[in-house]
Amino acid sequence: MGRSLSPARFAVEQDKKLRAFIRENHNVQTLFKKIQSAAFHAEAPSVDLFVAGFPCQPFSGAGQGLGVTDLRGKVIHHIVNYLKARLPTSFLLENVSGLVHRHPSTFEHILALLIGITDKRGQPMYTVKWKLLNSNVVGYVPQSRNRVYIVGVLKKAQTEPFKWPSLVTPPGLAELLDPVPATPLAQPQSSLATSKLKAAYAQARSAGVNPSSQCIAVNCDARTCSWKVDSTPCLTADRGASHGFWISDRGGRMTVAELCRLQGMEPITNPAGLTDRQIGHAVGNAFTQTVLARVLAQLLYSAGLTDHVVDPWLTLGRQPEAAACRRTAKRSRAQ
């Protein structure tokens, strides 16, 4: 959902309203509706960098966990077919950690498919690496979001070994929140959410945490309520659609701008007709932009596409989008 800095040869999105958003906000030459379509496989060109986040629901602990028996779980095979046919210089794939932990045989199968892209002599054409990365210590955002990242570099193009980004210390959640009137004793409209909120507050007090004066993010809409101090649980699409988490010392849910910051994005200024609920859903379904930026910095350098590592953290000493958001929030509080 972040800014396009250079033209993208193509993108894939089947949601009609998100397609309109992409056209309004991003420089994309061709926008395909489905990766499964004949048009995609016939027309999608080779690129220097291919990035895909294939559907996570089949592998997520929040879903039914059907794996590749879920039709959405078969999208990975279309991705591999594209890689085989077009041989992009580099690729990055992302999915939930449940792919590794709950479906290890499927994960090993996916890795085997990627390593199994071979030349005429039967030699692997890609160097393939993978790692579980948490957005809080890699993306410099106060969100616990563990995802598996798989990267590949075409061996004939590779100039340097690929290295994963270094770990960093994230800011506290309070630094990313907008200045709004605080009503700590407020409760959600839903009686079920209220009961879960009260249970979370009781747990917090037992742990020596004061919900009225400390920033606690409560996931009071989930089947199993969870909470974190000055940080948040994982922001999912469903949670994003319901304005994220309940903030205890504020007495209310998060704003759309705050959800964007939680994913390392600048707040969206041109929604292109999307409602707040639709934006929140899309943000929760997206990559953490700052993790993506840091991994891509290493990947592009390894693939010989840049002559040095342009890592936002190493270059600026801090994550730029979140830093800008904090400066904006501080100015607003001072006014």
Q: Model-derived features: where do they sit?
A:
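C-terminal target-recognition/interaction regions appended to catalytic cores
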Residues: 195-335
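SAM cofactor-binding core of SAM-dependent methyltransferases
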Residues: 1-36
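Glycine-rich, N-terminal phosphate-binding loop of Rossmann-like dinucleotide-binding domains
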Residues: 54
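Class I S-adenosyl-L-methionine
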Residues: 40-49, 57-241, 250-252
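Alpha-helical recognition domains of nuclear gene-regulatory proteins
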Residues: 25, 82, 113, 295-298
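Conserved beta-strand scaffold positions in the cores of enzyme catalytic domains, especially
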Residues: 9-11, 30-31, 50, 128-132
